[in-house]
């Protein structure tokens, strides 16, 4: 597993993947800083007139309808079309799906457009699979363990990887189930850590798409990178404000061997 982390992180830093982020306004700047610190290049191109064209030249695309508008929905649809036509991996982050009807309807309408990965919390994943009603806004009310069936259903339905974030992360693909223990509770006290993980997942998928690293391992490595950085940041910070700064620094500083040593991975 250490080799997977080493190779994935090396490719991200060597290739500086260009990630098109159609994401929510609350986390846009934080997401861009996370990508830059990790070794990727962010581009917040989300207008309908430009989204498809840009998705064709990007290495990865994030679709995150956390603060959606009618125009952004159109831009997301165009970006997905452009990504699919060009073979660009795209990631769906189903923010607050299940709890709000309009975004739930939209997410349900695009989930069959073959996202390379879906990343959300347990309640979002359960709701997207049609097995539950969603959480409390962006907060999960289901356990990660309870989302296993939903993640497996979505992985089979899309042919992609499904990642469920929590105290222990769950990574599921058609023939694998992996549990990852890492991170720190302080990550939950900084807005944007989850949403930026979706963007970083797109970066890892884009950087490794032409390698022998599987999409499952690329998604796992992205989560491990964030988890390890969270642990390092927690050792240096005493409160959320200083943690946010330390987290960005740790994403930049940490090497693959340190990531592998700080996370606990088990195959189910």
Swiss-Prot record:
Its EC number is 2.7.1.50. The keyword Iron does not apply. Pfam families: HK. Pathway: Cofactor biosynthesis; thiamine diphosphate biosynthesis; 4-methyl-5-(2-phosphoethyl)-thiazole from 5-(2-hydroxyethyl)-4-methylthiazole: step 1/1. Keywords: ATP-binding, Kinase, Magnesium, Metal-binding, Nucleotide-binding, Thiamine biosynthesis, Transferase. It comes from the Bacteria. One of its GO terms (biological process) is thiamine biosynthetic process. ATP binds at residues 119, 165. It catalyses: 5-(2-hydroxyethyl)-4-methylthiazole + ATP = 4-methyl-5-(2-phosphooxyethyl)-thiazole + ADP + H(+). Its cofactor is Mg(2+). It is an enzyme of class 2 (transferase). SUPFAM superfamilies: Ribokinase-like. Substrate binds at residues 44, 192. GO terms for molecular function: ATP binding; hydroxyethylthiazole kinase activity; magnesium ion binding. Catalyzes the phosphorylation of the hydroxyl group of 4-methyl-5-beta-hydroxyethylthiazole (THZ). Belongs to the Thz kinase family. NCBIfam families: PRK09355.1. This is Hydroxyethylthiazole kinase. It comes from Corynebacterium glutamicum (strain R).
């Amino acid at each position: 597993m250490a080799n997977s982390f080493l190779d994935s992180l090396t490719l991200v830093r060597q290739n500086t993947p260009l990630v098109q982020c159609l994401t929510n306004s609350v986390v846009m700047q934080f997401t861009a800083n996370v990508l830059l610190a990790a070794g990727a290049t962010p581009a917040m191109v989300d207008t309908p007139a430009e989204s498809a064209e840009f998705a064709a030249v990007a290495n990865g695309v994030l679709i995150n309808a956390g603060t959606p508008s009618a125009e952004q929905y159109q831009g997301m649809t165009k970006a997905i079309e452009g990504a699919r036509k060009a073979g660009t991996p795209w990631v769906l982050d189903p923010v607050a799906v299940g709890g709000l009807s309009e975004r739930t309807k939209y997410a349900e309408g695009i989930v069959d457009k073959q996202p390379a990965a879906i990343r959300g919390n347990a309640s979002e994943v359960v709701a997207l699979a049609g097995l539950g009603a969603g959480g409390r806004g962006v907060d999960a009310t289901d356990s990660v363990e309870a989302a296993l069936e939903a993640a497996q259903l979505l992985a089979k339905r899309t042919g992609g990887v499904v990642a469920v974030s929590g105290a222990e992360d769950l990574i599921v693909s058609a023939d694998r189930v992996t549990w990852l223990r890492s991170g720190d509770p302080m990550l939950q006290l900084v807005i944007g850590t989850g949403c930026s993980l979706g963007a970083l997942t797109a970066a890892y998928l884009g950087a490794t798409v032409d390698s022998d690293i599987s999409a499952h391992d690329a998604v796992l490595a992205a989560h491990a990178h964030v988890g390890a950085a969270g642990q390092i940041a927690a050792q240096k910070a005493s409160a959320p404000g200083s943690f946010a700064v330390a987290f960005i620094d740790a994403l930049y500083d940490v090497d693959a061997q340190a990531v592998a040593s700080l996370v606990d991975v088990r195959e189910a």
